[in-house]
From Swiss-Prot:
Binding positions (S-adenosyl-L-methionine): 10, 87, 90, 115-116, 166, 224, 249
UniProt-listed Enzyme Commission number(s): 2.1.1.314
Molecular-function annotations in GO: diphthine methyl ester synthase activity; transferase activity
Organism of origin: Dictyostelium discoideum
Function of the protein: S-adenosyl-L-methionine-dependent methyltransferase that catalyzes four methylations of the modified target histidine residue in translation elongation factor 2 (EF-2), to form an intermediate called diphthine methyl ester. The four successive methylation reactions represent the second step of diphthamide biosynthesis.
The keyword S-adenosyl-L-methionine is assigned to this record: yes
Name recorded for this polypeptide: Diphthine methyl ester synthase
HAMAP family (UniProt xref): Diphthine_synth (MF_01084)
Record carries keyword Transferase: yes
Gene3D superfamilies: Cobalt-precorrin-4 Transmethylase, Domain 1 (3.40.1010.10), Methyltransferase, Cobalt-precorrin-4 Transmethylase, Domain 2 (3.30.950.10)
Organism superkingdom: Eukaryota
Catalytic activity: 2-[(3S)-amino-3-carboxypropyl]-L-histidyl-[translation elongation factor 2] + 4 S-adenosyl-L-methionine = diphthine methyl ester-[translation elongation factor 2] + 4 S-adenosyl-L-homocysteine + 3 H(+)
GO biological process: methylation; protein histidyl modification to diphthamide
SUPFAM superfamilies: Tetrapyrrole methylase
Length: 273
């Protein structure tokens, strides 16, 4: 029997590939990973179930990170599909799942799809001109991680663009509830372009290494791959007050731009009052 790990792409239920759709149709159970990304726009679990004509089981953080025992056991007897928004290998969790399956001698077939890592080309910056991608997590009163700053610095020195993947908090517990063993979860939170810029500038103010400033050119994107996709370019200062709408958001710190990239950049330039 086979464990299929299937990318759903970035849009709605119809973004699944034909190969992925066929695997879903012949699987006895369908799981949807529901915490490293978000289904596009107004797409609901019900919409997926109607399109696939299959019942979908939500695989939350606890289930996936605890080893997916139930799903793996099922895969030893029947074909099972594990659905991932974007591409299957957009998160290390899914790599770990493949390793677990191989340890149990369960055949794994991965069916790829579009992810933010390649769809980001929609902004006009050439994919081979990107440096290291960084993840920007929500700051707290006590924690302000800045290890990403050094990677941005390397990218900037080399004239490379930096893609910033913005934090998602789904089914997260507060420290108090975690310590007390209470399964009470915080409301979902999705970092915005504005919050990302604020945190970038805050760390620059602390580190003072002049890696970037409020006049650095950048691009904010929201809902990439969906019908209401939004792309706006400008300086950090200009984008700080732009409303990018509903999640998911992504952010790019521009490096040195080819003249064609510059032309494309200007087509998305923020409108000034």
């Amino acid at each position: 029997m086979v464990l299929y790990i299937i990318g759903l792409g970035l849009g709605d239920e119809k973004d699944v590939t034909i190969k992925g759709f066929e695997a879903i149709k012949k699987s006895s159970k369908i799981y949807l990973e529901a915490y490293t990304s978000l289904l596009g726009g107004s797409t609901s679990i019900e919409a997926l179930e109607k399109f696939y004509e299959k019942k979908i089981i939500i695989a939350d953080r606890e289930m996936v990170e605890s080893g997916c025992e139930e799903m793996l056991k099922e895969s030893t007897e029947n074909d099972v599909s594990f659905l991932v928004v974007g591409d299957p290998f957009g998160a290390t969790t899914h790599t770990d799942l493949v390793i677990r399956a191989k340890e149990l001698s369960i055949p794994v077939k991965v069916i790829h799809n579009a992810s933010i890592m390649n769809a980001i080309g929609c902004c006009g910056l050439q994919l081979y001109s990107y440096g290291q991608t960084i993840s920007m997590v929500f700051f707290t009163e006590t924690t302000k991680p800045d290890s990403w700053y050094d990677r941005v610095k390397i990218n900037r020195v080399n004239g490379m663009h930096t893609l910033c993947l913005l934090d998602i908090k789904v089914k997260e517990q507060s420290i108090e509830n975690m310590c007390r063993g209470r399964l009470i979860y915080e409301p979902p939170r999705f970092m915005t372009v504005n919050q990302c810029i604020e945190q970038l500038l805050e760390i620059e103010e602390i580190r003072k290494e002049k890696v970037y400033d409020q006049d650095t050119l950048c691009i904010g994107l929201s809902r990439v791959g969906q019908d209401d996709q939004q792309i706006i370019s400008g300086t950090m200062k200009e984008l700080l007050d732009v409303d990018f709408g509903a999640p998911l958001h992504s952010f790019i710190i521009c490096g040195d731009m080819h003249f064609i990239e510059k032309e494309y950049f200007e087509t998305f330039r923020v409108k000034k009052n």
